Design a protein with these regions (language model features):
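Nucleotide/phosphate-binding catalytic cleft detector across ATP-hydrolyzing
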Residues: 1-155, 163-280, 287-297
Length: 297
């Protein structure tokens, strides 16, 4: 059986997805690398490294080499990409793969080139850079070649990409540095300010998933969480409600809604009419926040 040599990569701030031609999504793991500074060696990548966040000794850093959709550490990103490419290809990787890789629509040419170069260095034979909204539209089953307006809102781990696409091109777009990671930081700040308790990223993410929302819930939920009292330094347990968390997220979720409105205002009338008829396609991990679709409506 021939080796799979065409793969697609969604290189996100929070996670990385790898698609292999003819096989579908073959890998989904956190974009995290555990790096040993003393030994100058990568200790873990992906889910194993994510489990180390906040739990490593001083010589080991659990880092995200991507921030807000762009590379912040080229060498670590290259090593991470190489690892995931080899893992996705398996033993059948007799040839270097052709890789399509996504970038936010608002990246600069320098940032775009950095992603391309890191992908080549990681072992690609050919590299095709695809704007994230275009990839999201294709993945949603839309025929982007038709003369019809489609609005894509991709709330990723580092940025929110908003675009109106028609005839295989981006007519209007905007990329804002607000994301599902911003939701986590909102929760961390709220708990610290309100309860004098510090919680980690993983706890904040769990709160977001279980009781977080962008729109009022029919039934209020509560969740018990554990952290560290910032005054005494001792372990602390508190209970937060879904109403509290919605309030903590309100500024960020409203900024996303405002950014969508700003793109619509710049959209040609005919395409805006198409969007009104066809609706908005929400993608990305942040779009899974409960009530996000209702808020945008």
């Amino acid at each position: 059986m021939a080796a799979t040599t065409d793969i697609g990569i969604d290189l996100g701030t929070s996670s990385i997805l790898v698609y292999a031609k003819g096989k579908g999504i073959v890998l989904k793991e956190p974009s995290v690398v555990a790096y040993d500074k003393d030994a100058d060696k990568v200790r873990a990548i992906g889910e194993e490294a994510r489990q180390m966040i906040g739990r490593t000794p001083g010589n080991i850093m659990a880092v995200r080499p991507m921030r807000q959709g762009v590379i912040t550490d080229f060498l670590i990103t290259e090593r991470m990409l190489r690892y995931f490419i080899q893992k996705a290809m398996g033993r059948r990787a007799f040839r270097k793969p052709r890789i399509s890789i996504c970038v936010p629509s608002g990246v600069t040419e320098v940032e775009r080139k950095a992603v391309e170069e890191a992908t080549y260095q990681a072992g690609a034979r050919e590299v095709l850079i695809v704007p994230e909204p275009v990839a999201a539209a294709i993945g949603s089953g839309i025929d982007i070649t038709k003369p019809c307006g489609n609005m894509i809102v991709d709330i990723g781990g580092g940025t929110t990409d908003i675009a109106v696409i028609s005839l295989a091109g981006t007519v209007v777009s905007n990329s804002v540095k607000i994301s599902s990671e911003t939701f986590d930081q909102d929760i961390i700040r709220y708990v610290r300010k309100t309860y004098n308790v510090f919680i980690g990223e993983q706890t904040a993410e769990a709160v977001k998933i279980r009781i977080g929302s962008a729109y009022p819930r029919a039934e209020e939920k509560t969740m018990e969480i554990k952290g560290r009292n910032v005054i005494t330094g001792l372990p602390a347990t508190i209970t937060v409600s879904s109403d509290e968390i919605r309030g903590a997220l309100a500024q960020t979720t409203n900024q996303i809604a405002d950014a969508i409105c700003a793109v619509l205002e710049k959209t040609p009338p005919e395409l805006a009419s198409d969007v009104s008829d066809r609706g908005i396609i929400l993608t990305g991990g942040g779009s899974l926040l409960a009530g996000m679709d209702e808020l945008i409506q």
